[in-house]
Design a protein with these regions (language model features):
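Hydrophobic transmembrane alpha-helices and immediately adjacent juxtamembrane helices
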Residues: 1-262
Length: 262
């Protein structure tokens, strides 16, 4: 007879198992989850370098490619953090094995941490690999490590939570694809990834300042090249506020079991 196992305030074994499952899931298909987004981002860099890289003036005292590189890194990080949590939970729901995650003695908070950390890990791994691949072509440096780290963690965590929230809400892959294509991709492309928002006319300039993705990219860019288009204090407040709000929403939904429990 197996001895009785006592679980403390936190089920560390269960939490570690869930996190490990999420990480093994994307490492198992690394060509799709790590190499593919890296190649896509490098293609963006190559196209812009060949098309307008030499004729574009410096932005913030750096070349256009140096300005664009941090934006591409954060965009890849955000998209892959979102994809990891959303696809993992969505596939479990569609295949009917989400019960394997819900039945173990894991609290809603532990489920949230496990899924969110898995998404963050994929986003950060993609960002690291992409940065290393970019090094021979673009001069990358760290201007302010604190801003770089905070906005990298904030971007990956925010999009992990958004992915989890989307997967809970969606009932089929069409709905998940709609959010990915019309919300995540749109906000990422209109957040100053490829341009400085200072070049935008009104009212597009004002509208960009209501895009939370802009502050993620702007803060990360400042941490890397020392240039920011917006207020760093406002950006940090927006990032923290969005993460806290989304965390509380996800936790509340997991507690209620909305669209997860019969």
């Amino acid at each position: 007879m197996l001895p009785e196992r006592h679980i403390g305030a936190v089920n560390w074994v269960g939490l570690g198992t869930l996190y490990g499952k999420e990480c093994r899931r994307f490492f198992k298909v690394w060509l799709q989850t790590i190499v593919a987004p890296t190649i896509t981002s490098m293609l963006f860099l190559a196209v812009f370098a060949l098309a307008i890289g030499r004729v574009m003036p410096e932005i913030g005292g750096v070349s256009f490619l140096q300005f664009m590189a941090p934006g591409l890194i954060v965009m890849a990080m955000m998209q892959n953090s979102f994809a990891n949590t959303s696809s993992s939970l969505m596939i479990s729901k569609v295949q009917g094995n989400v019960v394997d995650v819900l039945m173990p003695p894991l609290s809603p908070g532990e489920l949230l941490i496990g899924f969110a950390m898995g998404g963050m890990s994929r986003g950060l791994v993609v960002a690291l690999v992409l940065s290393l691949v970019m090094l021979p072509f673009v001069h990358l440096e760290v201007h302010h490590f604190g801003f770089l780290l905070v906005h990298a963690l904030g971007a990956s965590l925010m999009l992990s939570l958004m992915g989890l929230l989307t997967a809970i809400w969606a009932e089929k892959f069409d709905q998940l694809a709609a959010v990915t294509n019309f919300i995540i991709t749109t906000l990422a492309f209109l957040s100053g990834t490829f341009y400085s928002i200072e070049r935008l006319p009104e009212p597009l300039l004002t509208a960009s300042q209501f895009n939370p993705f802009f502050y993620l990219i702007d803060g990360f860019r400042y941490g890397m090249i020392g240039h920011a288009d917006g207020s760093l204090a406002v950006g940090a407040a927006v990032v923290v506020g969005c993460v806290v709000v989304m965390w509380l929403i996800c936790l509340k939904i997991l507690i209620k079991g909305y669209r997860l429990k019969a």
